[in-house]
Design a protein with these regions (language model features):
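Helix N-cap at the start of a conserved alpha-helix in ABC-type nucleotide-binding domains
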Residues: 15-17
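A short, surface-exposed alpha-helical micro-motif characterized by mixed small hydrophobic
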Residues: 46-48
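Short loop immediately C-terminal to the Walker-B catalytic DE motif
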Residues: 10-11
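Short, glycine/charged-rich "phosphate-handling" switch motifs in NTP-dependent
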Residues: 52, 64
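Helical segment within the ABC ATPase nucleotide-binding domain
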Residues: 19-31
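H-loop/switch region of ABC-family ATPase nucleotide-binding domains
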Residues: 40-41
């Protein structure tokens, strides 16, 4: 299987670049069966390119499922900053 791993590919990119990147990833998946694994925080981009998600918190899988189930309230419970020591 072909696999592409990307770490925050949306970071620092403008809307036009994000659209082109999303189109490219979707085309590669469709045309050659490329699987893409994203480490990403930009929710609109994730929704555009993914069909499944997994939320990791401190190295543990805390939520996963169909991309349609991924929403702000679900993420908010895991994205709060840790208290200062």
């Amino acid at each position: 299987p072909r696999l592409l791993i990307l770490d925050e590919p949306s970071r620092g990119r403008g809307p036009r670049c994000l659209q082109k990147l999303a189109d490219l990833l979707l085309r590669l998946n469709r045309d050659i069966g490329l699987t893409v694994l994203l480490a990403e925080q930009h929710l609109p981009f994730i929704r555009r390119v993914a069909d499944r998600f997994c939320v990791l918190h401190r190295g543990r899988n805390v939520a996963e499922g169909d991309i349609m189930a991924l929403d702000e309230p679900l993420l908010a419970q895991w994205m709060t900053p840790d208290p200062a020591p």
